[in-house]
Structure formats: C-alpha cells, structure tokens
Amino acid sequence: MEKINEYGSERIVSPERTGYDSYSLRPKFLSEYIGQENIKERLKLAIQASKMRGEQLDHILLAGPPGLGKTTLATIIANELNANIHVTSGPILEKQGDLAAILTNLEAGDVLFIDEIHRMNRNVEEILYSAMEDFQVDIMIGKGPAARSIRVELQPFTLIGATTRSGLLTSPLRNRFGMIFEMNFYTQEELKMIITRAAEVMGTLIDDDAALSIAKRSRGTPRIAIRLLKRVRDLSTVRGSENITLNIVEEVMRLLGVDEFGLDEMDRKILKTIIEIYKGGPVGLKSLAASLGITEDTISEVYEPFLVQSGFIARGARGRIATEKAYKYLGYNTLPGGLFDGFGNIE
C-alpha cells in the first residue's frame, strides 16, 4: 500500500510542534505529569517553599530536545502557583521595547514564559538582566541628544525560559536562573503510560501491547507519542473497533513509514549518507547537511538527538560516525574503522 502522511511535508515523527498537536491532552498539574521524576520532585519542593515563605519562585530554565514537555511544564508551574502565565518566544522579541512592554504589564506573581530563549536578540536580552535580578528595567525615552533613561520598577515575577540549545545561552543570562533543569528522553514505560492516559482522555480504549508498540516508535518523545496515537485512533474509528489493537497500530505504522525503532525515511537517509558517501564517518555537520540538502540546525536539533541517544550515530571531535548498530540496522557489512563499498561488501 502507498505510504500516507497527512502532515504533508511535516514528519509524523518530528519532535517539532505542528498545528495538529493538541493542547487539550496536556496535564495541568504535577500530579498528572508523567516522567521527569527528579525534576518534578525538585519543583514540588521549590514551589512549596516559595508558597510557605510568601516569596516569588526562582527563575527557571528548562533545557532539552523538542517535544519533551517544556511548554507543558511551564504551564503546570503557573497552575501550581495559581498564577497567570504570559507566553512569548525569543525570535519575536526583536526590539528592547517589545520585551519592556511585556515586563511592565506583568502583575505580582505572574509567570513569563519565553520559548526558544536562546534565539533572543542580544540587545533585547540585556533588559532581562536587571529585570530578573532586581525587578526593574531601564527604558530609553526619546531619541538623539534629548534621549534619556528612566528606571521602571516591576512587579515580582518568575521567568521560565525554554531552550533546545542551552550551549547558545550567554553566561550572564544563564547565571541569572535560580534553577536549571535538563529534560531527558522518556522511557518506553513512561510513554506507554502517557499514551494510555491520552487515549482515556480521548474516550478511547487501547490494549497494553498496542500502547507499548506506539511507545517504542515514539523516539522517547511525548509529542510524537500523542501524534501517533491520534493517527492510530483514526484507523480504529474507521474500522469500527471498540479499542485500539496491536494489529491496527502496526498497519498504521506501515502506512506512515515508521519502523519498530521509530525511524522514518529521513533517518535512514542520514545513516545511509554517512555510511555510503562518507565511508561511515567521521563527517562534519556542514558536509552532511550539504549532502542531504537540509540545514545544519535541522540535523543537530531535530534528527541527531534521537539517533545519538538510541546508538545509531556517535559524535566525536572530528564529526559524526555511523555505529555498528547503524550498519546492522541497514544490513551492511563493516570492518573495524567502518570501511564500506556501498553495496554491502567489505573493502
């Protein structure tokens, strides 16, 4: 049968947010949030302590690959604090005035969430320094020789920043966060629980083996798990099935081109390129991106994290290397050092 993907050019297993992702399935409180146990425990303690002291919660940085629940966790923190949350993102804050307008309109106890904070303009970022430390901001009034700076006192607030590339944050900004959490990929058991809960919220029953099959293909990412569940539910509905079965899951995955490892055609293309064109590597990011016809950021932020985490690619000082697992996955023969002639034969 022909493979289908109703997302058009968007990958069904992309961890990036799409217009098809549903906010209604997200947990609202820490008690409903599955996974990231260490982070949850630390947050519970910090939130409880801030409430008992009547103080503002420390600023928080949430770091990790896309789709792991950074936005969801920021919303949960606001809910736990019974606070209003204001959402923006680094790329749209182009001028200092854009951020100053948001900061001066915050009320006491509010939460400001800045997604992709690493992409914020450096001039804009400087306004955050005094805002985070002293709850005040200097605003320039007028232009030219008549311009003057006035200091505006801000209401106490909590800033939550989210980043997929914490290494791009400047030290002055990073050092102003009281708590920094590195979010990890989810286990299959955690994803199975997330899928089962989401199916229940959707009003759908799902067999345990079916939920586990989806979890195995979800690349350690809840956003992908929910997206796959929705597509499986579609076929289940069309078939008139009372619950989602393993057979239905496997049929949908074949149609979507997602294998039992959660890899799709682009993942396989990346691995084949490293092995066939670059003899298994090492290959630099720039060269790999040029060969694949995609941007370096797309490789490093979207594809690589899972391929590295799952052991198909290793990264070193000289570049990316296809692992023995990648060779075996694609059915290639290898020598120590990864020599390969492109046709499954050893050179």
Swiss-Prot record:
Residues that bind DNA: R315, R320
E.C. code: 3.6.4.-
Alphabetized HAMAP family for the sequence: DNA_HJ_migration_RuvB (MF_00016)
Entry binding sites for Mg(2+): T71
Domains: entry comment: Has 3 domains, the large (RuvB-L) and small ATPase (RuvB-S) domains and the C-terminal head (RuvB-H) domain. The head domain binds DNA, while the ATPase domains jointly bind ATP, ADP or are empty depending on the state of the subunit in the translocation cycle. During a single DNA translocation step the structure of each domain remains the same, but their relative positions change.
Source species, domain of life: Bacteria
Residue ranges of the region described as Large ATPase domain (RuvB-L): 4-186
MF terms (GO), sorted A to Z: ATP binding; ATP hydrolysis activity; four-way junction DNA binding; four-way junction helicase activity
Small ATPAse domain (RuvB-S): annotated segments: 187-257
Record function comment: The RuvA-RuvB-RuvC complex processes Holliday junction (HJ) DNA during genetic recombination and DNA repair, while the RuvA-RuvB complex plays an important role in the rescue of blocked DNA replication forks via replication fork reversal (RFR). RuvA specifically binds to HJ cruciform DNA, conferring on it an open structure. The RuvB hexamer acts as an ATP-dependent pump, pulling dsDNA into and through the RuvAB complex. RuvB forms 2 homohexamers on either side of HJ DNA bound by 1 or 2 RuvA tetramers; 4 subunits per hexamer contact DNA at a time.
Catalysed transformations (reactions): ATP + H2O = ADP + phosphate + H(+)
Recorded GO CC terms: cytoplasm; Holliday junction resolvase complex
Region (Head domain (RuvB-H)): 260-347
Family: Belongs to the RuvB family.
Keyword entries, A-Z: ATP-binding, Cytoplasm, DNA damage, DNA recombination, DNA repair, DNA-binding, Hydrolase, Nucleotide-binding
GO biological process, one term: DNA recombination
Binding site for ATP: L25, R26, G67, K70, T71, T72, E133, D134, F135, R176, Y186, R223
Oligomeric and partner information: Homohexamer. Forms an RuvA(8)-RuvB(12)-Holliday junction (HJ) complex. HJ DNA is sandwiched between 2 RuvA tetramers; dsDNA enters through RuvA and exits via RuvB. An RuvB hexamer assembles on each DNA strand where it exits the tetramer. Each RuvB hexamer is contacted by two RuvA subunits (via domain III) on 2 adjacent RuvB subunits; this complex drives branch migration. In the full resolvosome a probable DNA-RuvA(4)-RuvB(12)-RuvC(2) complex forms which resolves the HJ.
Metal-binding recorded as keyword: no
A Pfam family hit: RuvB_N
Keyword DNA damage: yes
InterPro entries: AAA+_ATPase (IPR003593), AAA_lid_4 (IPR041445), DNA_helicase_Holl-junc_RuvB (IPR004605), P-loop_NTPase (IPR027417), RuvB-like_N (IPR008824), RuvB_C (IPR008823), WH-like_DNA-bd_sf (IPR036388), WH_DNA-bd_sf (IPR036390)
Organism: Fervidobacterium nodosum (strain ATCC 35602 / DSM 5306 / Rt17-B1)
Protein name, UniProt field: Holliday junction branch migration complex subunit RuvB
Subcellular location: Cytoplasm
